[in-house]
Amino acid sequence: MLINRLELSTLDLIPQRDYYANVLELPVHLEGDSLLVKAGKTDLIFHQAPSGWTGEYHFCFNIPENQFPYAKAWLSSRIPLLKDDKGNDEFKSQSWNATSLYFKDAAGNILEFIARHDQKNSVNSPFNNGQILQVSEIGLASKDVIAFAKELCAKLGVSVYKQDLNDTFTPIGDEDGLFILPVDGRIWYPNTGVPARMLPVKVDVEVNGKAFQLEGVPYEVR
C-alpha cells in the first residue's frame, strides 16, 4: 500500500513551514491556507485549522534500511529525540525487523523515522533529506479498533500487519504503507503523553494499482 498524499490540520502554518524546510530540509510550498511538503514519494499537506483547534497526529517516514545510525546522528544534531521512561531513544522491533526513532514537529505531531530491514533499499551515500523516502504510516484512532480494522481490510484488500487483531492497537497494510489503528485515547509511543485522537485526515492510497481515498471523522473510504 502506497500513501501518495496525506492531508492533515494544523493551527499555525508558518512554524510548520520553517520546521520542514529547515530541520528536515524538505521542499515546501505555502499557498493560502495550505502548506505542501514533498516527503519523497508522498505529498504531505497541512491545512489551516480554525482558531482553538487542538490535536496531534502520528505519522512515519521510511528511510533506507541501512541508514538508521546515520539518520539518527543527522536528526539528533538538529532537534531532541523522544525517549521512553528508561531513557532509550532508538527502538528495535523483532517482529517487524525494523529500527525506529521518534521526534516532534513544530505542531507537536509525533513523527518517526523507521528503517525496515527486510526492504532492499540500502544506499551508500551519507544520510540526507533525499533519504526521507515516503510517509509510510498514519495513525487513525477509533472507538472500536477491531471493527475498524476489519472494515478497512475488506474495503482496501489489505491485511493485518505482522500480528493478530487487537482491540487497543492494530496495524494494517504493508511495509510501504500502514494504517496504525489505536483505540481512541491510547498514548502514542514512546511515553509521549500524547493521546491518539479521532482527528480530521484525508489520505490517498494505492493498493495493487487501485486508488482509494480515506477522509473525515468518522473516516470513510472511497
Predicted feature residues:
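N-terminal beta-strand motif that seeds the catalytic metal site of vicinal oxygen chelate
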Residues: 1-14, 118-151, 155-159
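Short glycine-enriched loop/turn motifs at secondary-structure junctions
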Residues: 1-2, 53-55, 95, 131-134, ...
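Basic, Lys/Arg-rich alpha-helical nucleic-acid-recognition elements, primarily the DNA-binding modules
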Residues: 1-51, 55, 62-64, 71
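Vicinal oxygen chelate
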Residues: 13, 61-106, 140-222
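Conserved catalytic-core motifs of GNAT/GCN5-like acyltransferases
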Residues: 28-32, 116, 160-164
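Short, charged/polar, Gly/Pro-enriched secondary-structure boundary elements
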Residues: 44-45, 54, 109, 177-180
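A short, sequence-level motif marking secondary-structure junctions
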Residues: 49-53, 117-119, 184-189, 219
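Hydrophobic, well-structured mid-protein blocks that either form specific transmembrane helices
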Residues: 87-131
